[in-house]
């Protein structure tokens, strides 16, 4: 099977947004116009093409990022639909990792919202070029230029309108293209026929002003254009497009478009912009990786002739074909039925069949080429973030980093007979989702599951019931507290046991000190003259790492500290690794009294949107939850309150907010950072943990 679309004519894009900005509807319309769907599915009716897990259709939100392929004007566009709900941030991270560009969808009434900020930051981390689609222009309170302003103010993004809406709310009739200087009016409800006309007189001045500022902004990124612009020469449409493309691909410029996916306006222009401004796999820098046995860096060019390399970015269990592994090919080609190397795990894998996905239908293909996104059937050991490569040319592509869970609950099957079934279900779900963890508490024997928020765990429990037919009871949520040191001290740890024959002897002096936030545990060996022999150093480090997991104050893992091993002693006969391991853990225990240990709790960034009359109640409620209000602003006819609130105080907030605002308030929350717990609360936590 020969290559159908050249690499230059391939686009791998994601569609990212805040919950409810209309992302799934936008994707639907793209599939409709590119000829993959014959009838448009509405999210409100629960019949959307991309939302194919039962729960997604019920809740009207997108949880798993389905990858789908479409064609537009002779190009292949691979689309990854990413969830906008904050509990599924990992899905967004893993899809951004394999994209070349993205369309950020905003709600024309709200502009940039908290989850938009989170997703935007993730996209910046991975250097993903973006175009912005301001959707829902038909909605009451829609304001295009306000939305463009929020991109600049809240995200400090160099964003500029390349379109201007004609009318808004109910009078939204068409779109002015500022690049080509023409107005498009829609002639039918499906938006397939539009007519290009002259820009209406009442919009001429505004369009000219915006076009001038667009040209100026783009010229700043391109010296040749700058010279032409300063000399007052006319800049052609092609030159302008090329400059916007260059700025966008370099992640220095963000073109902003407008429309209403629900009313079928503006989506084809978004597709055109994807082809015009977002990069092909050949436009992005070649992917870097390392050799498995050394840390030597190698690159893989985006070409069919290079050795095969791919990254697995999603694992799913499919009722018909079993385990599906979604992967992005960075270089080379792969035939179904062939063998590849999973270099991350050092295992050989056989690719049974290769499927190209279209939301929930699939087409079997025999070969995938560089730049393609597809799903493989038959991989046994591959999980999210693993590299697959040619057996003779090994490489490990950079993997993804997944956040630790911030909330834990105990779970047990409703009937004891289901215990094994539940264990299997949890193992499968953890394989699909790296931010979900399941383990057995060694002390209580309970099964504990952890995730990114209440909704995340609700959906896991729900999926167990539907997909694995296991009903479970869930305990009260537990917060993932941490501990750290606020002071430095030098401490001794000595373990001596003499009982006839061979004894045990380990002796260390360690200096503990606070580390920067987020840096984790750092161990330094500063032994001189072999007072602790080199072969025991790893045992000291391992002993500390084990002991850190059990905490020093209330049994929570200790984070962000440095430990410097600087002195100690040993015994020729009695010293062994075990003794030094125990000595190190004793040193950590002794540090508890000297290093001023504190308990840390996860703090969430919360944004509440409410009608003005509930403002007082909500502010009072946030303060009673130990929250700090960071800012307030009007948005349309609602008020937005932004606050930092401890996660432990936010359980059940959805219910409280509903009753406080008669169901008219909404909120979103994102884990932000760890902060010290006030003394009174720390005492309660310690008492509770000792009482157990």
Curated annotation (Swiss-Prot):
Which UniProt keywords are listed?
Cytoplasm, Elongation factor, GTP-binding, Nucleotide-binding, Protein biosynthesis
SMART domains noted in UniProt: EFG_C, EFG_IV
A cellular component term from Gene Ontology for this protein is: cytoplasm
**Database matches in CDD domains:** EF-G, EFG_III, EFG_mtEFG1_IV, EFG_mtEFG_C, EFG_mtEFG_II
For this protein, the record's InterPro entries field holds: EFG_II, EFG_III, EFG_III/V, EFG_IV, EFG_V, EFG_V-like, EFTu-like_2, G_TR_CS
Q: Which residues bind GTP?
A: 17-24, 81-85, 135-138
Q: GO biological process annotations for this chain's record?
A: ribosome disassembly
Q: Which Pfam families match?
A: EFG_C, EFG_III, EFG_IV, GTP_EFTU, GTP_EFTU_D2
Compartments in which it is found: Cytoplasm
Stretches assigned to the tr-type G domain: 8-282
Please name the GO terms that the record assigns under molecular function.
GTP binding; GTPase activity; translation elongation factor activity
What is the annotated role of this protein in its UniProt record? Catalyzes the GTP-dependent ribosomal translocation step during translation elongation. During this step, the ribosome changes from the pre-translocational (PRE) to the post-translocational (POST) state as the newly formed A-site-bound peptidyl-tRNA and P-site-bound deacylated tRNA move to the P and E sites, respectively. Catalyzes the coordinated movement of the two tRNA molecules, the mRNA and conformational changes in the ribosome.
Similarity remark: Belongs to the TRAFAC class translation factor GTPase superfamily. Classic translation factor GTPase family. EF-G/EF-2 subfamily.
Annotated NCBIfam families: EF-G, PRK12740.1-3, PRK12740.1-5, small_GTP
The protein, known as? Elongation factor G
What phylogenetic lineage does the species belong to?
Bacteria, Bacillati, Bacillota, Bacilli, Bacillales
